[in-house]
């Protein structure tokens, strides 16, 4: 039976890999502030919780508490090095781990769980919510384009087949509303190519099938980004709530900058600097690190390159010395602040969803080199739909290809046009998160669903 309570207790089930848990916690913090009478129990692994709660504990609302659950790795287990091995171990143990965590939270708070909020990857939360008679509110951390491919996964497989796309890579996904410029090659692994039988692929397949059953799906985007996608997803899902972009609502906290990046930028001309970063997960293959280095050296564009220390071994001999006068290679950079600086004129990126919106916030055109997952879809959207950046020709870094991108964005009329499009997009996004904007109204709806549970 469904449950209504004046003392809401929201169980939040996180996916503790990549950058999934942090944006979910960001939403929970907003919800906790908007519904101070509710209690939010946040469940993730100890490693994940330590990384996302540590820096914000002094400002964390008192109605949020984290609970550590098992990572599913048996004691003494030796990893075999299989792709997504850690995800598989976690996923197998997760249903029972989350249940045990909720029992503990109920005992501590004295409140029964009244609502399940979960990362969409935790698809079995649908079954748990049904068993408990609760609303299930999955959070999609990426964009509406990738969400659509999962919701339509069975139709896509029926149309394209699952025996590979060789020779059909550039055919268009024009049978899915809002996806007419997407090519087969842009799809994520696990949709029609890759190991479709892996536990991770099967998990995402099942997720796409059950999302239409959710009480509401909420997402870090805004309705006006793509009317076609928005309207179609509204027709496929019970309730579809765009509540972002998050970085325009709650700017990331200012963190101490020990690398000197921001001071260095003060000495550079407007829109002259190339910023390079591929997120917290990805490093380009060694040959592409070399190609990027050669392009920077030959073009002599000022640059800041956020490169992990362990990847420095792939830099060409003498590169750091030769570029010292106009470039910085640092192990980490305050990305949002760097992209917001007027000196930055281009962003070489993997095209992750969060990085994309930090670039939009700063008005910086993107040079996209996608690697996996939704990144290819995002790159296509950046170049062909939104027209706020370019993709690397051929999909891999080459010296000549990069130099051409630098020239287009920093020196040619195209760069000016991209920046104009970015300004217009930023203005539209700002309206969405404004007092009467669509994202603001949708967030009010989400608060109502979370704090005043109704029939599921």
UniProtKB/Swiss-Prot annotation:
Q: Can you state which reaction this protein catalyses?
A: an anthocyanidin + UDP-alpha-D-glucose + H(+) = an anthocyanidin 3-O-beta-D-glucoside + UDP; cyanidin + UDP-alpha-D-glucose = cyanidin 3-O-beta-D-glucoside + UDP + H(+); delphinidin + UDP-alpha-D-glucose = delphinidin 3-O-beta-D-glucoside + UDP; peonidin + UDP-alpha-D-glucose = peonidin 3-O-beta-D-glucoside + UDP
Q: In which pathway does it act?
A: Pigment biosynthesis; anthocyanin biosynthesis
- Outcome when changing residue 141 to A: 6-fold decrease in catalytic efficiency
**Modulation of this protein's activity:** Inhibited by Mn(2+) and Zn(2+).
Q: Please report which protein family the annotation says this sequence is part of.
A: Belongs to the UDP-glycosyltransferase family.
Report further notes.
The expression of UFGT is not detected in white grapes.
**Entry protein name:** Anthocyanidin 3-O-glucosyltransferase UFGT
> What is this organism's lineage?
Eukaryota, Viridiplantae, Streptophyta, Embryophyta, Tracheophyta
Per UniProt, what is the name of the gene that codes for the protein in this document? UFGT
